[in-house]
Every structure is written in C-alpha cells, then in structure tokens.
Amino acid sequence: MSIISKNSKLLVIVESPNKVKTVTKIFKDLGYEKVTVLASVGHTTKIKDNRNSYKNTGIHPDEDFRVDWVTDPEKYKVIEQLKAQSKVADFVLIASDPDREGESLGNHIKQVLRLNDSQYFRIKYHSITKEAISTALDNPGYMNKYLCDAAESRQIVDKMIGYALTPVAKAYIGAKSVGRCQSAGLKLVVDREKEIQNFIPEYYYDLFVEFTKDDIKYRAKYIGTADKKVDR
C-alpha cells in the first residue's frame, strides 16, 4: 500500500507531453482523482556559457569543476506553470525517466521548485501501465545523488571536449564537430574500414577425416597435435 494518500492533491511531472494523457488516466484509474500531470519537455536547466570559465564552457576545473547552471530560457513558461501547480499540491511526484539523465533532470526540477524532502517523492517505472505505476507509487523514494552526479559529469565532459576541440578540428581537418563518444566511435569505424581495405586474401585449407563405425558416420577436423596446433 502506498504512503501517498489517494485524497492528496498531486502534481506529477513527466518528461514528455506525449505521456501526460495516459499517465493522468492511469492515476485516476488507481483512485487518485486530485492529480495534475505536467511535462517538463526535457531538461529545464543547462550549463551556461561563461567567458570567464574554461573555453567559455561555464565549467571551472580549477574550482573543483564548479559548474554555472542556468535555467533554460526556452523553459521559462514551463517552469512558471510547474511552480504554480507545485504551490497548491500536497506532494510533487517527479516521474522523469528511470535512468541517470532522468535523475539529473528530476533533480534540477526539484531545485528549481525549491522542494524539500517533505514536499516531493521520486517515482520510477519502466512502462506506462497501471501495474508499473501502481508499483512505483507503493515504493516512492528520493533523488539518487550518485545518478545525478554521473549524469552531470557526462554533461561536463561532453561540453569540455566539444567546446575545446571542435574549433580546432574545424580549422585543421574540416570536421563538423568533436564529441566524447562520436569521435571515439568514428575512430573505431575508420580503423575497421582500413583493415578491410588492407586485407589481403590468403588460401588456407581445413583437413577433415570421415570415419564409419557400426554404420554410423563421424567427421573430424584436424587441429594439430597436443604440442602444436595448426594455424591454417
């Protein structure tokens, strides 16, 4: 049984507007009539560009990697709507995606709305079904700091690498952009393509012997002796 009363006035925050209608219906089917479901439409907070930081990234490596976070101007209207609804709700349920990015997104929403632990719960579900959401409501929790740190570290590394190396790559080799994953992935593709282009076909043979015993046929492959195996 959930510790969240069905008589409570709830604000449920999801990521995508496409989920609002379905999640609203499921909550009402579960008996939560006083529910409002709103979408954050993705991240509400981003790293601010800052000329006084490393490569204008808004990241300060010399200050224990302090980050200049800022509310995304494109989300002002969304945030105002979330703030207004959170003020009249008994509880805010942060139902962003159940992964590290969803955890970071939810944590930034918690900070923007200035929610303390008595005002919100974090709920996680892996499918938008009545059963999954019911289970999530029976097991509400709070933000996972370690997942948040992991997501924010990913954002920091992405921006530091991209901002520092993209201008250089554009100037010297005409690359469109440089990224933490895309550049490493591209190198693997290029290395593999070079192997294919440089491949020289060689003939080799396999030696098989067929045996018959008691009208049953056996086929064996010669792979060498106990001391030395045949390469080809």
Question: What do these predicted ranges mean?
Answer:
Residues 1-155, 161-164, 223-230:
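Intrinsically disordered, low-complexity regulatory segments
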Residues 158-226:
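Prokaryote-biased recognition of long, low-complexity C-terminal linker/tail segments
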